[in-house]
Amino acid sequence: MFDAALRGLIDKVKSGSMDRRAFVQRMICIGITPPMATQILAIGGVATAAPPSTYKPTKCGGGGPLKMLWWQGPTLLNPHLATSMKDQDGSRLFYEPLACWDPDGNLQPVLAAEIPSIQNGGLAPDGKSATWKLKPGVKWHDGKPFTADDVVFNWEYAKDPDTAAATTATYRSTTVERIDDLTVRILFSKPTPFWADAFVGAPGAIIPKHLFADYRGNKSLKASNNLSPVGTGPYKFIEFKPGELVRGEINPQYHMTGRPYFDTIEMKGGGDAVSAARAVIQTGEYDFGSNIQVEDDVLLRIEKGSKGKSIRVAGADVEFIALNFTDPNTEADQERSKTKHPLLSDPAVRKAIALLVDRETIKKAIYGRAGNTTANFLNGPEQFVSKNTSWEFSIEKAAKLLDDAGWKPGSDGVREKDGRKFKLLFQSSTNGARQKTQAIIKHACQKAAIDVELKSVVASAFFSSDVANPDTYTRFNADIELLASLSTQPDPERRMRTFHSRYIPSEESKWQGFNIPRYASRDYDAVIDAAEVEIDPVKRAALFVKANDILWQDTVLIPVIHRMRVAACSNTLRPVISSWTTDIDNLHDWYREV
């Protein structure tokens, strides 16, 4: 699994002649990030070291209310059916995974008693299994015990194709077996370099078997508990108004000592990012605002308020434009993925549109401190970032590409070919920064004689997990759309397998696939399949770089801005935010310090 030099370094850490920090620094020098270095140590038999806790409260409760703003409000509270981070966040208020990611990218146990390692017998040396020990005494909010049966059920539920779970990719090639009431073993079909995927982080949160057993498969959307969660988390469910409000109260039987700190919790939806920032930083009406995607000059003015501040976390989030490879207005055999887009199926047309995205203006006019221009979909960790790509803004070159492809300006000034006008429907969620970005791109397209119609959809609807909603980003009833890909773990496998052909959304899959461009490439599929089983970390990183480069070469999408994650926080709140996962994956450690 490891070459001699790497094995020698791991042995030094085991013996105590090299500390963990020195090992991580050596890994950084060869392009391996701290989170991945930690994973290498775990595979090599070195147990995960728990960092010192920064949590100061000494008793459970007494912290009063925690009021949060998610202007993209949750619309569903089942982590397996959540197609967007807002629904993962709403679910994570109540449901928990076996482990979560801390700000440094280290795994921390939640429902697990410990993190698996070779040293504690949890990881197989051949990389083909991981054994989790569960915490004893954990109870669901209705008093039923949490056991290994619940963990096994979540695997069965998610891998069932009729369930159409958004998490199916994580569980489809694994087997989960019950060893005893408090032990489960995950078996991988092949050596698995990144084993900490299943049951980890917000997407790995676990639902109760006794409430969902009758709703596995094609009944998954009929479960009433999709809207009224019964979890194991620090807060118990009180109320849910989809898109508007989620409320919870303290769980006095919570399994972590001295936690939680707050007595009640509220996640308010609606409004926009600007009003959310103001409500935290200027008026102090709320304690925390997530995803503050606000023009930087606006945020600078808001930051003059005295009640709070903005916080920025660097990660791998990217704002990008997806290009539809299928015709949103046509179906073949009731399946859109079998159609070809009349304009965007031509690589020259896709490359021309990419040339019309003025990233530098978008950065300067909108993102400022919160983003940098990029040509890469994969922008971190560093060893996975391609140096082979570049971007350019040129209306002249775009026009020539279109001319050569047969798209000539007509009498009305709009390009046409074979009687078809070059017109694009460009959609995104309702947000000031995104509407400005759309306008900048439309202006350039008009100069290239392309007619662009802009559409904005209320964020709670655009990112909804409601399969009946025709305006979701996964339905993609437009030609191009602007959105973001946000990190949920340090490893890029989950993000990059998004564009594998097996994950194309369809009516059959209840629109749960994340391959929203409907891109199908045997070359790309082969690279991802190889990366999923490559143990050598350097070779594996090279495969993900290659996958990124294929997306760039084929212009499957147009990366625009490598975004920082920005939130608004009251001066007294002490949140624990990690760029490797969702904002509230460490909610149990939040408290207030007056």
Regions found by a protein language model. Name each.
Residues 216, 370-389, 566-569:
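Mature extracytoplasmic/periplasmic domains
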Residues 70-120:
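Protein kinase glycine-rich loop
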Residues 2-18, 22, 26, 50-61, ...:
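Extracytoplasmic/periplasmic ligand-capture domains
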Residues 23-48:
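N-terminal export signals
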Residues 560:
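Active-site-proximal polar cores
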